[in-house]
Regions:
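Short amphipathic alpha-helical segment within the helicase RecA-like ATPase core
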Residues: 1-185
Length: 185
């Protein structure tokens, strides 16, 4: 599976299929008042209250017949390794729920992660690490593509500017390919 990331300056909220929102331990969504979703805040809060007691990192529910919300519970003071693990478990969650396209909003990320500017890079780095699969010798290859749209209206997010994460992904995937390759006997 591959992950395609697009930075968008302008987005039509009605065309967004799946919203990904980060929230605290109590599922309080930061930056919610700046989003298009604030119109349906009472329904969203009711769904959160119904599922609040469940010890899950992610909540998925429908807003209407064509749109879903995925809430990601993030604890304060996460280290970069924990952010990567959260991204990896999020990848596993969306893959198991067949959610292949979703949108992340900078207003949500900006208010929630003002201390760690690299949070989104670390989170998506974990997703990319988890998405690796060795299918060189498979006859039926998995061609699913995860599409992530990052709405960056205020140019707050410097996503992708740090090439360290891309270099790590390439090196780790090459190493995994070499380890998975059968030996020459």
């Amino acid at each position: 599976m591959s992950i395609k990331i697009s930075l968008k300056n302008n987005i039509n909220d009605k065309l967004v299929k799946n919203y990904v929102l980060f929230c605290d331990e109590n599922f309080k969504i930061s930056g919610f008042n700046n989003l298009y979703l604030k119109k349906s805040s009472s329904e969203i809060q009711n769904m959160v209250n119904l599922n609040k007691n469940i010890k899950k990192e992610f909540l998925l529910f429908n807003i209407n017949s064509s749109q879903k919300i995925i809430l990601i519970k993030v604890r304060k003071n996460y280290s970069s390794a924990e952010n990567e693990k959260l991204g990896a478990s999020f990848y596993k969650f969306v893959k198991s729920n067949f959610v292949f396209k979703f949108t992340i909003f900078d207003q949500n990320v900006k208010e929630f992660f003002s201390k760690n500017k690299l949070f989104l890079d670390e989170f998506i780095h974990g997703m990319k690490l988890k998405s690796y699969s060795f299918d060189k010798y498979k006859s039926k290859k998995d061609n699913d593509i995860f599409e992530i749209d990052i709405f960056n209206k205020d140019k707050f997010l410097n996503f992708g500017k740090n090439k360290r994460f891309e270099a790590l992904i390439e090196g780790i995937n090459l190493t995994k390919d070499l380890v998975s390759e059968p030996g020459n006997i």
